[in-house]
Amino acid sequence: MRHRHDLRAAGLRASAMTLVLVAALVTGAAPGRAGEIVPSVGLTKAVNGGGEATAQVGLAFRGDLAPFLMSELGVTYRSESRFDDQLKLRMWPVTASLYLKPLPALYAGGGVGWYHTTYDYAPGVPIADQTKQEYGVHLGGGLKVPLGAGAGLDLGGRYVMMRDQNSRLIPQRFDPDFWVTSIGLAFKF
């Protein structure tokens, strides 16, 4: 019972932080400050999954809150196989991040995320598929390379940390942490 209360409290804190970051992004777009939309593709790999890296796609919206501080709201899609392809995870992370920019081309920081996760079991496994909502945190950074006045190349990476997950397969628990590297094209507006 206590564990469920702790998870609910953590979810409420993450939701509150996300709302604060969204409000900061919306109100922080003062005249003269540029926003960006960044479609991206990349590779993602589970830290303890033992499988191959798989492709991921994403879309992020960024805005400068100050000359040295950038906010980001992002959505991605990723999938991975576990337990010798007996379980396929499909995940739709929705994240909010704050990045420090010590130089205009470099950024580093972290944030929170809501991870809509579907557990698809192989047809021969007598377990029903299920979908869960999880929360996590991430650390990351990147390099922005200008391609002109209105666009730039964005090279990024992040490490995502989540609580261990239960599985109906053996072993019954697994570490869902993963890393992502991506390349995107940032369009300024």
Task: Please describe what each predicted stretch is.
Residues 41-45, 122-126, 165-168:
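Extracytoplasmic loops and strand-loop junctions of Gram-negative outer membrane beta-barrel proteins
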Residues 170-174:
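Short proline/glycine-enriched turn/loop segments at secondary-structure junctions
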Residues 46-55, 83-87:
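Solvent-exposed loop/turn segments connecting transmembrane beta-strands
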Residues 19-20, 27-28, 160, 185-188:
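Hydrophobic alpha-helical segments of integral membrane proteins
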Residues 60-155, 161, 176-189:
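Gram-negative (and chloroplast) outer-membrane scaffold detector with strong preference
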Residues 33-45, 106, 178:
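Transmembrane beta-strand segments of Gram-negative outer membrane beta-barrel proteins
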Residues 1-35:
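Cleavable N-terminal export/targeting peptides
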